[in-house]
A protein has these predicted regions:
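A general alpha-helix detector
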Residues: 16-24, 40, 44, 205
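Residues at alpha-helix termini
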Residues: 2-3, 28, 48, 161, ...
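Short glycine/serine/threonine-enriched helix-capping/active-site loop
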Residues: 83, 267, 314
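N-terminal [4Fe-4S]-dependent radical SAM core
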Residues: 2-6, 26-27, 35-81
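Short, flexible loop/turn elements at secondary-structure junctions
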Residues: 85-87, 175, 316
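Canonical Radical SAM [4Fe-4S] cluster-binding loop centered on the CxxxCxxC motif
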Residues: 76-111
Length: 328
């Protein structure tokens, strides 16, 4: 009231606002006395944390969907496996992850895989009494590995763990300039069920600014290759608020993505990380060149809805433009 600014998530600072709604939904088990209705949860989030109605309803909707997903996995006796590949074609402007340009570190990939294989052996022993629910290979960009390096890694993973109850096996293909038919065939050969082809934007000028050395056309070609190789579960990542982008840029991106029609979409609100080159870029160009609003988030949400998608997870980060969220 004093500043004229409204924060859509109110005073909430945690990364998982859906946990609040989930807590009440889990307490509403059959036989519970005085269970909270969705209207009660909405009022609680608005009155306690000053959340907007829109964001509170989004959290409740996603929590209900998450609850159904969790009921289908071994929530207490199971585990999920994440494997990180810390190499990329180049380092993006906004990135603060542990990632090394593959062309400078190519000679060390074999050593990294050897070390990773030792860690896989350790994890296998540590988790032998648990049930593996899902596997996610991320990075970095896992597809910076050569086809035979991918086969070496995937072979080790498949030989080390019981996949009989795995619901999903994801490899983040990520950058279009790292995706080839041979690599896609290697993923398919070892039973990968889901991949990500992540353009972040479908505007060429922005791709150039953020340091992604590929074209919009390469994104479209990589997506088509994946479909040709039989992948029926393809995700795409987008970032809203990239340098110089306006709602018109987001509209163009969503039009291009809708034509490809991925099976899922992850929409990130740009987060400014101290360890990224973006911090230096802002010093030189000004933060006013970064725009993300409820309006641009809504453009993305409407585009996802046109592809018959519904949000199923949500998280937030520090330093996010307009205090917004990331939604899948």
């Amino acid at each position: 009231a004093y500043t004229g600014k409204e924060l859509p998530w109110g005073t909430l600072t945690g990364i998982r606002p859906t946990k609040i709604a989930m807590q009440f939904l889990e307490e509403n088990a059959p036989g519970t006395q005085n269970p909270m209705t969705e209207a009660d949860i909405l009022s609680y989030m608005q009155e306690t944390y000053y959340c907007s109605e829109e964001k509170a309803l989004l959290a409740i909707d996603i929590a209900k969907r998450e609850k159904r997903i969790l009921a289908d996995i071994h929530y207490e006796k199971g585990y999920s496996l994440y494997i990180g590949i810390p190499f990329c074609p180049t380092t993006c402007l906004y990135c603060s992850f542990t990632s090394f340009p593959i062309f400078s570190w190519k000679d060390r990939v074999g050593e990294y895989l050897t070390a990773l294989e030792k860690e896989i052996d350790f994890v296998r022993e540590a988790c032998q009494d648990k049930i593996l629910d899902s596997v996610y290979i991320g990075g970095g960009t896992p597809t910076t590995l050569e086809p035979e390096e991918l086969r070496r890694l995937l072979s080790k993973v498949r030989a080390s763990f019981d996949f009989s109850q795995v619901k999903e096996f994801t490899v983040e293909a990520g950058r279009a300039d790292s995706i080839t038919r041979d690599k896609l065939r290697a993923l398919k050969e070892f039973g990968v069920t889901r991949i990500s082809v992540n353009p972040q934007t479908m505007n060429q000028e922005t791709l150039n600014i953020i340091g992604r050395r590929h074209t919009v056309g390469q994104v479209e070609e990589a997506f088509r290759l994946a479909r040709e190789e039989g992948f029926t579960n393809i995700n795409m990542d987008l970032i809203l608020g990239l340098p110089g982008e306006t709602k018109e840029h987001v509209e163009r991106t969503m039009e291009a993505v809708t034509r490809l029609c991925p099976d899922s979409l992850t929409v990130h609100s740009l987060a400014i990380k101290r360890a990224s080159r973006l911090s230096l870029w802002i010093e030189e160009n000004g933060i006013e060149t970064l725009h993300n609003t409820d309006e641009t988030m809504e453009i993305a949400a409407e585009g996802a809805a046109r592809m018959n998608m519904k949000p199923y997870y949500l998280y937030r980060q520090k330093g996010t433009l307009q205090n917004l969220e990331n939604t899948g």
